[in-house]
Amino acid sequence: MANQKDTAETLARTPLYQLGVELKARLTSFGGWEMPVQFSGITREHEAVRNAAGMFDISHMGKFTLQGKNLISQLQGLVPSDLSRLQPGQAQYTVLLNPQGGIIDDIIVYYQGEDNTGTQQAFIIVNAATTSKDKAWILSHLDQNQVQFQDISPAKVLIAIQGPKAIGYLQPFVQQNLQPIKAFGHLEATVLGQAGFIARTGYTGEDGFEILVDPEVGVELWRSLYDAGVIPCGLGARDTLRLEAAMALYGQDIDDNTTPLEAGLGWLVHLDTKGDFIGRSVLEQQKATGVQRRLIGLQTQGRNIARHGYQVLSDGKVVGGVTSGTLSPTLGYPVALAYVPSKLAKVGQPLEVEIRGKAYPAVVVKRPFYRSSNKG
């Protein structure tokens, strides 16, 4: 997920925008869009997802369909993850890399399979603020004589329903049985009698689904889920939920100048099982010599919240910076993500964070800060 603000004059609206207005959502600008930041309150929405179910309008995110022969082998050159391992109906969270190994964006690649002519199909979801950048980058590195690329971002609604009871709320509106779908699994589905796409993915650390449908179906599905008792949630709860789960926010925790090895995303880098890809030589070097800095989890003392941009200190000297921070609604204490030198990244390492001109004690803790016992 990405972080970017724009002026009110340029803000786009999703097909579900009016539903947010009807529910008196508080709105904000995000990635070029006017989006709900909260409906009934961030804490209530956060707790609904952790304990039952909440739903999010994520239609602002970029959505691409691709098809062509040798599609997967071409995409292999853009990401460090081994996409050849994907079976039809499986997805891979990964990153687009620049030649310096920096992260252009974090994305999900959904492999839909290969037909009897050898044509492969895939669906990619990218961050809202980076949709144009990602589209240009992908197109510039694919053989467009072999691959058909379509940006379907404006044409589709994307709804996320998240939480331990998400499947029970969603199932009545879907013809197919959702239970067999594993994490990062997906399928073509019939939603409210119409064609749709459902994936068992999310950005909250809980079990849940993301549903791609036509706008009119999306409006009907949102109303149906709301009438069934699902709590509408905004970007505020989405941020506290993802931060508790230590999921990176593009533009804050990761960007063009951070590599996946620095950002704790080494599990996405499959150097031993795939060939060349953009940025590979940099990651090989980092793997061999070690990274100079690492993204860590921090817990600050009391209720002092380390916010984005705050300085991290060791022995009174600035050694790094906070990328994201909040008071965890689930845990009841402040948590943060920050970059520090690798030698200071060990769990238990005492540090300090400068908050409003004063240094407060902090300690490096394991990530994620919260791990659900309800994941599907």
From Swiss-Prot:
Keywords: Aminotransferase, Transferase. InterPro entries: GCS_T, GCS_T_bac, GCST_C, GCV_T_N, GcvT/YgfZ/DmdA, GcvT/YgfZ_C, TrmE/GcvT_dom1. GO terms for molecular function: aminomethyltransferase activity; transaminase activity. GO terms for cellular component: cytosol; glycine cleavage complex. It holds the Pfam family GCV_T_C. Its EC number is 2.1.2.10. One of its GO terms (biological process) is glycine decarboxylation via glycine cleavage system. The keyword Thylakoid does not apply. It catalyses: N(6)-[(R)-S(8)-aminomethyldihydrolipoyl]-L-lysyl-[protein] + (6S)-5,6,7,8-tetrahydrofolate = N(6)-[(R)-dihydrolipoyl]-L-lysyl-[protein] + (6R)-5,10-methylene-5,6,7,8-tetrahydrofolate + NH4(+). It is an enzyme of class 2 (transferase). It comes from the Bacteria. The glycine cleavage system catalyzes the degradation of glycine. PANTHER family: AMINOMETHYLTRANSFERASE, AMINOMETHYLTRANSFERASE, MITOCHONDRIAL. Belongs to the GcvT family. The glycine cleavage system is composed of four proteins: P, T, L and H. This is Aminomethyltransferase. It comes from Nostoc sp. (strain PCC 7120 / SAG 25.82 / UTEX 2576).
